[in-house]
Amino acid sequence: MVVIRLSRAGAKKRPFYHMVVTDSRKRRDGNYIERIGYFNPVARGQEVKLHIDMDKMTHWQKVGAQLSDRVSALLKEHSKKSETAA
């Protein structure tokens, strides 16, 4: 099954996550099919905390990719911010 989930990167005590499309049997930080965004939980000031390429996200969801729990929560948060900004 194809899933959209977070892959950890960054230094110790400074996490940074790539939002990736991957096979569910692969390791968390292993090979992936496509990178579609990123999440920086420790963003400061004007740094972007969450970036998602929505065209790629909708494409993979139409193809049948499942969202992880954390990614679906981040997507909800992202859509709320988009609505309030618009």
From Swiss-Prot:
GO terms for molecular function: structural constituent of ribosome. Gene3D superfamilies: 3.30.1320.10. PANTHER family: 30S RIBOSOMAL PROTEIN S16, SMALL RIBOSOMAL SUBUNIT PROTEIN BS16M. Coiled coil: none annotated. One of its GO terms (cellular component) is small ribosomal subunit. SUPFAM superfamilies: Ribosomal protein S16. GO terms for biological process: translation. Belongs to the bacterial ribosomal protein bS16 family. Keywords: Ribonucleoprotein, Ribosomal protein. Disulfide bonds: none annotated. HAMAP family: Ribosomal_bS16 (MF_00385). This is Small ribosomal subunit protein bS16.
